[in-house]
From Swiss-Prot:
It comes from Coffea arabica. Disulfide bonds: none annotated. Keywords: Chloroplast, Membrane, Photosynthesis, Plastid, Thylakoid, Transmembrane, Transmembrane helix. PANTHER family: PHOTOSYSTEM I ASSEMBLY PROTEIN YCF4, PTHR33288. GO terms for biological process: photosynthesis. It is found in: Plastid, Chloroplast thylakoid membrane. Pfam families: Ycf4. It is a multi-pass membrane protein. GO terms for cellular component: chloroplast thylakoid membrane; photosystem I. This is Photosystem I assembly protein Ycf4.
Length: 184
């Protein structure tokens, strides 16, 4: 989503609170709890899961492996739930022609650098760059190239924009900032 006026363009960036992340975190949590319960029930010799008889699973080695997969899945699931709750990657890109400043803000992981805030002068922007990689896993990313600072990604690598959408976005931003477009 973007908000625009004559002199200011604010592009809101969606972080890790996406439906796909919620689905993966939930599926991973349920699956890992299932694996852990099967491993524990094979150790205890009791059915903790009613639709799967624990007598068919021997604790060594199947029960141990299932327990390990369950614990590993719980760690990965809790990592996903933490990134969702902290909303890592959420933020905005603010382009202000009147002030001549570009501000990029993102939320990171908790700690000293939780708030990621970058500020540049518009006159230091060298170009808007489109990077296109075709193939099975096609990828189109929009970058802003800053003199002496390198490139800063403006779109997520998993955003999956069509060639027309990425070109349109790059053209509008380059026109707004009055900088050229480069395609790689």
């Amino acid at each position: 989503m973007s908000l625009r006026s004559e002199h200011i363009w604010i592009e809101l960036i969606k972080g890790s609170r996406k439906i796909s992340n919620f689905c993966w975190a939930f599926i991973l949590f349920v699956g890992s709890v299932g694996f852990l319960l099967v491993g524990i029930s094979s150790y205890l010799g009791r059915n903790l899961i009613s639709f799967f008889p624990s007598q068919q699973i021997v604790f060594f080695p199947q029960g141990i492996v299932m327990s390990f997969y369950g614990i590993a899945g719980l760690f990965i699931s809790s990592y996903l739930w933490c990134t969702i709750s902290w909303n890592v990657g959420n933020g905005y890109d603010r382009f202000d022609r009147k002030e001549g400043i570009v501000c990029i803000f993102r939320w990171g992981f908790p700690g000293k650098n939780r708030r990621i805030f970058l500020r540049f002068l518009i006159k230091d922007i060298q170009s808007i760059r489109i990077e296109v990689k075709e193939g099975i896993f096609a990828r189109r990313v929009l970058y802003m190239e800053i003199r002496g600072q390198g490139t800063i990604p403006l779109t997520r690598t998993d955003e999956n924009l069509t060639p027309r959408e990425i070109e349109q976005k790059a053209a509008e931003l380059a026109y707004f900032l009055r900088v050229p477009i480069e395609v790689f």
